């Protein structure tokens, strides 16, 4: 190396630290992931539009979803600028507060709708703690596994299962089978990346099968949950009740064709409101019917790009905690998209899992914005 190179290196390392690292520490915003931001905004706009059309152009739903999006963006910015590594020490507090909220739902503070107690009344709005619990589970498991630094034994796996089981039982009591399924997927993904062995997954698989048999034999599922499973297996005999949802959703998507019937299409499953809960659980049917195969494919393409960015950030993180957070978020989105879209197409049972950024609902949208904020946080601090 010449004299000029030696001088340059010395200048760059004034104070014992590369200038580039000091600049990154002072201005992490320079390392923002623009692709993730753009995809998030596109999905949000897509969702607001579909909520408006799926509710027969009801301005009340439109206004609320716009308010939720604005609040979500504010929260995203806040989450993005607080170093995510502080969350490791705060994970016990986050976990405890989540349990308190889940317990509150089961008390008189809870708001019951259609036989389920999943919400807490906040004036004219309702909060759904089970949605925010998804992020809490990711942070809690990520913090625990990161401390093990890839050395995961049977005892560590048991602790992870216990950490998930407690909120899982509370959510079962609401009841909310869909979120319980999400917890299972998150636990599996985080254990895999965190260092669990194949034998651990084999043991968990056997225990899972035993648990399913016990649940079915003991009659622990609600009648409507059993009906949804049977309707999924064969919707034809049950087409007047639970099978109606699947049948109408399939008709709506199939009738959209390649280009769809348009956002203002008349005499459609959407405009005639044949599909129940179309602005929430079944909103993908509105996408398929109004925008057709091309619109649905575009939406799924945006989801694929979103999940890819999350996985890329997981690979770029400088620590295991950041990798686990990003992996959990990627799994969260991938699982929810797969189940929700599969549910509307009749290849998955109806579970009430929302479509990220698209389904109507403040708690779901806020949860997804928090997830994006965490990803941006990990990405911006990958050099620190």
Q: What kind of feature is each model-predicted range?
A:
Residues 1-23, 336-384:
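A juxtamembrane structural motif centered on a specific transmembrane helix
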Residues 24-40:
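N-terminal membrane topogenic signal
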Residues 36-247, 285-345, 370-374:
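Hydrophobic alpha-helical transmembrane segments of multi-pass inner membrane proteins, especially
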Residues 123-133, 173-175, 257, 261-262, ...:
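Glycine/serine-rich anion-binding loops at beta->alpha junctions
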Residues 182-183, 264-271, 302, 344-352, ...:
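Re-entrant/interfacial helical elements at transmembrane boundaries that shape
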Residues 244-251, 278-282:
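Short hydrophobic, aromatic-rich alpha-helical segments embedded in or entering the lipid bilayer
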Residues 247-254, 259-263:
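Extracytoplasmic/periplasmic regions of membrane proteins
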Residues 258-291, 321:
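Long extracytoplasmic/lumenal interhelical loops at the membrane interface
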